[in-house]
């Protein structure tokens, strides 16, 4: 572990407490000059570290995000982590890295802002700076294309677990890839895969996750104002949340869950779709049906109006409003 990583860990263990350069150097078995250099680098990554003559260093809390901080809490800290100030799309960057062979299993790409964030069915995902976490994880799972839906369900489970553990917030899952809080969408997941045509196996998958942490300063665009939400009203409400830890926990949970066969119990228990009349949108066509359950392979079991049963593996679903029900 580098001096910078060890210094970050030391500061976080004593958050809001003064640590002298001399004490830090003794603890980390390095020179005070090395401590100064590590602190300078951490500040450049966005950490608020105060210092004064003969006083020492103190790390102030806040929703900081850095490559070093994420690696510190990863179960597999050797995987590549890259944070960009701005990208068109983290999924696009991750796919390019995967195609070139640069990105192995678990490689992580984040952007503080996306210019062209994407959701399912070609939709855009609003990704302003200082409002959310926008990341893509490269996976090279031993799965067939038929099992691909379980990668998305694994990602939804991973985000729910991480948000519960780090933020203390319970999220609901809307089949197949949206997460809700207080009846507002706070997270979208987009999974894209490249497969071997002959074997039917997935060569690699890219899981894009957009998580709204705080309400944007200028609010959401008019077309999503009624449906979009965030975990916290503003940054001050999330002062206790370390974004690096949250990102690392999402990755840790995803890498663990994607290796676990089948559908997680949490995905079924936290799903808000089964047991409701729903509207299914498939292209320009819509129809109503009753959502019965989530199948073991992640598909949605619906009862059509003629009484027949259908298994959905794709499509847009929404709960039919009570005012629309006869």
Language-model segments: what does each one mean?
Residues 1-30, 44, 144-145, 153-171, ...:
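Long, positively charged amphipathic alpha-helical accessory segments at protein N-termini or as interdomain linkers
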Residues 58, 179-181:
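Short, active-site-adjacent cap segments at secondary-structure transitions
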Residues 173-177:
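Alpha/beta catalytic cores of group-transfer enzymes, especially the acyltransferase/condensing modules
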Residues 2-164, 187:
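N-terminal lobe of the biotin/lipoate ligase/transferase fold
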Residues 35, 90, 135, 178, ...:
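Residue-level signal for inorganic ion chemistry
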């Amino acid at each position: 572990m580098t001096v910078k990583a060890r210094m970050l860990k030391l500061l976080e263990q004593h958050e809001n407490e003064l640590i002298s350069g001399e004490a830090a150097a003794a603890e980390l078995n390095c020179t005070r000059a090395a401590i100064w250099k590590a602190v300078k680098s951490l500040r450049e990554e966005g950490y608020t570290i105060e210092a004064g003559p003969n006083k020492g260093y103190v790390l102030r809390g806040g929703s900081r995000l850095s490559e070093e901080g994420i690696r510190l809490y990863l179960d597999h800290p050797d995987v590549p982590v890259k944070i960009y100030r701005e990208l068109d799309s983290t999924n696009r960057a991750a796919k390019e890295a995967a195609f070139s062979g640069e990105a192995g299993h678990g490689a992580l790409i984040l952007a503080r802002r996306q210019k062209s964030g994407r959701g399912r069915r070609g939709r855009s995902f609003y990704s302003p700076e200082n409002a959310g976490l926008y990341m893509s994880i490269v996976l090279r799972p031993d799965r067939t294309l038929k099992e691909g839906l379980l990668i998305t369900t694994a990602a939804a489970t991973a985000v729910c677990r991480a948000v519960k553990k780090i933020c203390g917030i319970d999220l609901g899952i809307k089949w197949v890839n949206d997460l809700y809080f207080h009846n507002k969408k706070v997270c979208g997941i987009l999974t894209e895969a490249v497969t071997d045509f002959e074997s039917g196996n997935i060569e690699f998958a890219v899981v894009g996750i957009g998580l709204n942490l705080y309400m944007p300063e200028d609010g959401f665009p008019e077309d999503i104002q009624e449906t979009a939400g965030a975990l916290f009203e503003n940054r001050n409400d999330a002062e206790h949340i370390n974004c690096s830890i949250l990102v690392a926990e999402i990755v840790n949970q995803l890498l663990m869950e994607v290796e676990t066969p089948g559908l997680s119990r949490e995905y079924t228990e936290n799903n808000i779709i089964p047991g409701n009349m729903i509207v299914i949108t498939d292209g320009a066509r819509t129809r109503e049906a009753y959502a019965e359950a989530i199948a073991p392979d992640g598909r949605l079991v619906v009862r059509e109006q003629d009484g027949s049963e259908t298994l959905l593996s794709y499509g847009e679903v929404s709960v039919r409003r009570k005012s629309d029900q006869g």
